[in-house]
């Protein structure tokens, strides 16, 4: 056997193993989410490609339930952020809090420090908040005070808008 045929065989086995994992994810999702196979496929593509996703649709399509279910299935941390006109950038990223006992400021990390983030109704947020989220998505890090923190891997933002 040549070296290239061994590599092809190994690749073929790896693809078969990975497809079993994907099939298992679909089976688990189908137990909770009915009639949204297209959306589930797109969420998995985003997850596997390390990209971010914008989910558009009318209320009641189970967008939130789908994302939270996916997070449970892949054993990832999950946070849902409800975007409102009065939301501040620090509400996403976090801030420093004064600790009277230590006489020092300590960081309080925001909800972007999770693997899967559901940015619900992102179109309702002010531009500064959207900008803060876009920075997290692009740089995959957050600065709180003087410290920079790397976001967890995988880091996937799934934003919804109605």
Show the residue positions of the predicted features:
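Interdomain "pre-motor" coupling segment immediately N-terminal to P-loop NTPase/helicase cores
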Residues: 1-14
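Pre-Walker A (pre-P-loop) alpha-helix and adjacent loop at the N terminus of AAA/AAA+ ATPase modules
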Residues: 14-61
């Amino acid at each position: 056997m040549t070296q290239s045929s061994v590599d092809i065989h190994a690749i073929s086995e790896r693809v078969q193993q990975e497809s079993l994992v994907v099939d298992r994810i679909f089976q688990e999702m189908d137990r909770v989410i009915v009639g949204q196979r297209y959306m589930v496929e797109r969420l998995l593509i985003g997850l596997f490609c390390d990209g971010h996703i914008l989910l558009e649709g009318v209320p009641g399509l189970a967008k939130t339930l789908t994302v939270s279910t996916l997070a449970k299935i892949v054993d990832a941390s999950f946070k849902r952020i409800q975007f409102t006109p009065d939301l501040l950038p620090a509400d996403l990223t976090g801030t420093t809090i004064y600790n009277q006992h230590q006489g020092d400021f300590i960081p309080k990390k925001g909800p972007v420090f999770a693997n899967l983030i559901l940015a619900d109704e992102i179109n309702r947020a002010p531009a500064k908040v959207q900008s803060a989220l876009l920075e997290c998505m692009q740089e995959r890090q957050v600065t709180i005070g003087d410290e920079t923190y790397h976001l967890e891997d995988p880091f996937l933002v799934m934003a919804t808008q109605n």
